[in-house]
Amino acid sequence: MIKISFFDNQIQEFISGTTPLAIWKEHLSEHFKKPVAALFNNQPIELDFPLKKNGNLEILTESDPKSLEVLNHSTAHLMAQAVARLYPDALFTVGPAIKEGFYYDIDFQKHTISEKDFLTIEKVMHQISLENHKITREEISFEKAKKLFAYNPYKQVLLEKFRDQTISIYRQGEFFDLCRGVHVIKTNLIKHFKILKISGAYFQGDAKNKTLTRIYGTSFFKKQALADYLQLLEERKERDHKKINKELDLFMFNKEVGLGLPFWLPKGATVRRIVERYIVDKELSYDYHHVYTPIMANTELYRISGHLDHYASNMFPIMSLENGEKLVLRPMNCPHHMMIYKKNPHSYKELPLRIAELGMMHRFEKSGAVSGLQRVREMTLNDAHIFARPDQIKEEIKKIINLILEVYCDFNIKNYELRLSYRNPNNTEKYFNDDQMWYNAEKTLKETIKELGLPFKEAIGEAAFYGPKLDVQVFNALGNEETLSTVQLDFLLPQKFDLTFIGEDNKHHRPVVIHRAVVSTMERFLAHLVEETKGVFPLWLAPVQVLLIPVSAPLHFEFSQKIKETLQLQNFRVEINSKDNTLGYKIREAQKLKIPYQVVIGDHEMINNLITFRKYGSHLQTTIKVDEFVSLLKDKVLQKK
């Protein structure tokens, strides 16, 4: 007999081999409707998994987020089975559940598929669902697995990783696959799904390997949930900064130049320049010292910092020079700022020292991960490093958070949460080895946030290798989560670079480094702004704030030019549309470009020294004096509206 604890701390004895489904039917069906899977001692298992030891059982129902992951993993197998029926020669690699669905990487060998094939695959998937195959788990030896998948070279490679582990396969009808699970127990539980897109992906993410076909999909328990998600995808497409950019012409990429290397076009460069000037001025008001440092460095610098050991796969190849020197494009700015601190001796009275930079960095993102401005290979980070005494940590973190919240207010960022990231105490190998340091750093961060009275969440295992961090997770207009701001405590780099200050006792002491970014990279922040505003920038950020539209270029251009000069003297960004088009066409074009104010100038305006304007998205026209219009614009800019 085994003892199982479950709902409401009940403990019952069961025959060894009893399944979660049997326990649910006997004891839990009234409390938990529509079971999907289970957790046994916090480990996910199938409903038909035989329990053979004492433990705690938790039933996962359709409403549990973990259940959606199980469903999507199972749908990946359902899709693979359908593909196998349609393309018997297809070779399957991996098919995991991901954040909003699943994908499967497949070598179709002699076949090529496209989006036109999605409906055919979905039709077979629905057929298999109706066949209601039982999905069963089977544990086999390494040798048996090698024979079972002898036809599939990809599985042979994957199996080598599990030579000394328990190997499991899952079967449903004629289909079987190498998999850890967990899955639903029958195919007819998989009903509401959609294949979404197709792309290329290297086997195991290695560009040296063959390019496979990656098919993405998603699955839900309810038909309406699927419909709602598909509608959300359509809304995302409308907000996608890559799509909006086709109209606004803010940035571009060029294959001849290289993947993930953005060009900032005039209008995008204008927005970036405004953001950069804003953030620099804001940081100067907080007593930061702004610097410029080289975009590359000797590899020795990154050996000392530890990046060569922990971050080499994300760095570009080393450049070996004739004189033996080895240089590398920097993936981070922190080692350079360590060098600035180390240039001079420091007294405890000088601290904290705040060094900031809009620092260009280069990171070797895999080709499949590069996406618009959100994932690029060249980026400029709003970076800073604060060198402080240990007794100054709390106060500095509070100042950083106040700075972040001020910036968020100006950019109208309202939906966010604080997340404290700690190391995983059960898996400390990938972190700097100093238990006392980790304890002190995590304790300090947590106490500081509590003293500020701010709500926060905790994330175990998400810390940087050199210390715990505070991330500000921003939720965009469509509910997606992204990290814009981060604060990281670092007790390691000061040791590695032997940084010191002279204390009151006239002895050398070790400072603490606080890494900090407020608006992430310029690239990611512009993408965020575009998607949040749908390209309708507030007046203070708009690349063109006012478009002057003369009704007749020959008659009204000169007066339009005078108004342009008047506005430019007040530092407004103004253009004139003097093209030989109709007035209606010019106004529609201005709307398409999402220009905040469109000013029409005709005879009435010219004779009476007036302007007639309409705001973006409005049909209402207002006629006022030029100086009144200037005052209106100034107020809007001042209010960051």
Swiss-Prot record:
Cofactor(s) essential for the protein: Zn(2+)
Organism domain of life: Bacteria
Region Catalytic: start-end pairs: 240-538
Organism: Aster yellows witches'-broom phytoplasma (strain AYWB)
UniProt name for this protein: Threonine--tRNA ligase
Gene Ontology molecular functions: ATP binding; metal ion binding; threonine-tRNA ligase activity; tRNA binding
GO BP, sorted A to Z: threonyl-tRNA aminoacylation
Keywords noted in UniProt: Aminoacyl-tRNA synthetase, ATP-binding, Cytoplasm, Ligase, Metal-binding, Nucleotide-binding, Protein biosynthesis, RNA-binding, tRNA-binding, Zinc
